[in-house]
């Protein structure tokens, strides 16, 4: 058995694991460098596929030089085609591919030891914790660490009252003539058939006048099958966007993100902590994760360099999560139509306030001003319903989708 020791073990090389490794590779002035080992799964089903991450923040962010694209305007369309377009002021909507992020992080983390192991177990031990698993060649392996930061999905989903999936399937399209406005993101286009419960919308990230990532996204209890996604995307790209059959699919992106009101434990043992989606970084009402991962890993790195236990802070305030729980339950039970709620919010709420709200950074007074734009009676009924509904474990037969941070 291969046995090693380190101060900090990071399990998983997705957005959270890579972000934390990058921060720990560059100690602040006066801080002692830490021995860090990043353990990622060997190539195969346990390693996440290439994917795209999006978020909004002011221009001049730390990853701006790594971006595939960014935009200063967003557009939302209602089911009837009513269009709301908003400038983002000093913010940009940013797109970064996981392949580019990993390549840039690898260039900047030479001091971080990397291991391709399948981790089967993380257990506490005196003075820290240890990872047990096997190498890519199938040899037993053990790594002892003072601290473990684990970004893998838990073995079983935590108890919840509502369980939806944000599932999406996208085509990277090229057209023979200009077909897209590269200055505006089509954030939510509800001109697609809507399910009885949940919602569905189109999503377009224009990379040039003749290139774009075009996605079909649904919020529902179950994803579609491959044929269903092909039909939905063919309808959206061909008929709604007016591209017909005159386009070429150059690549495909797909993913499933659990959206629940579960409470995600951020501590799994005296020296073991969860980060990323496993630590609650996914916003339940939107599926966005990357920006919260950056806040979370920054706090973890600060704690480690200061010699403190690296307990990740809550990714979102309790008040924001309570509001999300109500919205998810109302969507799941068909009490509100997302195709009506989201366009109204973008139409009636100032964009700067709405973006703060979606980030969980608004005050209680601002939350009230946003909430007044939502259908009050269905949401109040849902509040009463949730007050008496306990969180329950997921059914044993329920598939556990691997989170793909968006």
Regions found by a protein language model. Name each.
Residues 193-199, 255-274, 327-350:
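FAD-binding beta-loop-beta segment adjacent to the flavin cofactor pocket
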Residues 23, 27, 108-247, 260-264:
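Predominantly flavin-linked oxidoreductase catalytic cores and closely associated redox partners
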Residues 2-38:
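N-terminal Rossmann-like FAD-binding beta1-loop-alpha1 element of flavoenzymes
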Residues 222-253, 270-273, 294-316:
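Flavin-binding catalytic cores
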Residues 23-81, 100, 169:
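N-terminal FAD cofactor-binding segment of flavoenzymes
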Residues 298-406:
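C-terminal helical "tail/cap" subdomain of flavin- and related membrane-associated enzymes
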Residues 55-128, 134:
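A conserved beta-strand/loop capping segment in the N-terminal third of enzymes
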Residues 9-11, 39, 142-155, 272-277:
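Short hydrophobic core segments
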């Amino acid at each position: 058995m291969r046995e090693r020791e380190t101060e900090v073990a990071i399990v998983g090389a997705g957005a959270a694991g890579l972000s934390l490794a990058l921060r720990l590779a560059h100690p602040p002035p006066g801080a002692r460098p830490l021995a860090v080992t990043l353990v990622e799964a060997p190539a195969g089903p346990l390693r996440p596929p290439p994917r795209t991450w999006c978020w909004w923040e002011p221009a001049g962010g730390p990853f701006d030089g790594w971006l595939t694209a960014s935009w200063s305007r967003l557009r939302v369309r209602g089911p009837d085609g009513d269009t709301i377009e908003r400038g983002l002021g000093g913010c940009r909507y940013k797109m970064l591919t996981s392949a580019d992020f990993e390549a840039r992080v690898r260039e900047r983390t030479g001091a971080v030891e990397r291991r391709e192991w399948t981790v089967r177990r993380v257990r506490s031990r005196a003075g820290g914790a240890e990872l047990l698993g096997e190498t890519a060649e199938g040899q037993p392996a053990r790594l002892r660490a003072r601290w473990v930061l684990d970004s893998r999905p838990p073995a079983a989903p935590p108890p919840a009252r509502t369980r939806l999936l944000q599932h999406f399937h996208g085509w990277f399209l090229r057209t023979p003539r200009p077909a897209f406005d590269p200055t505006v993101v089509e954030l939510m286009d509800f001109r697609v058939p809507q399910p009885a419960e949940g919602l569905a919308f189109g999503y377009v990230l224009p990379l040039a006048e003749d290139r774009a990532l075009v996605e079909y996204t649904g919020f529902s209890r179950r994803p579609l099958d491959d044929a269903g996604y092909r039909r939905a995307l063919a309808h959206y790209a061909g008929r709604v966007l007016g591209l017909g059959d005159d386009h070429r699919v150059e690549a495909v992106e797909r993913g499933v993100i659990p959206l629940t009101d579960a409470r995600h434990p951020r501590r799994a043992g005296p020296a073991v902590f969860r980060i990323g989606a496993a630590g609650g970084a996914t916003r339940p009402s939107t599926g966005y994760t990357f920006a919260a991962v950056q806040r979370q890993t920054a706090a973890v790195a600060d704690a480690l360099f200061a010699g403190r236990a690296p307990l990740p802070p809550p990714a979102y305030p309790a008040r924001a999560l309570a509001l999300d729980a109500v919205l998810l339950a109302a969507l799941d039970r068909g009490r509100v139509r997302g195709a009506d709620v989201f366009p109204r919010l973008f139409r009636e709420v100032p964009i700067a306030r709405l973006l703060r709200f979606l980030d969980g950074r608004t005050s209680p007074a601002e939350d009230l001003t946003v909430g007044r734009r939502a259908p009050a009676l269905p949401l109040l009924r849902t509040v009463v319903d949730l007050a008496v509904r306990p969180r329950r474990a997921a059914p044993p037969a329920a598939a556990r989708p691997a989170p793909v941070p968006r």
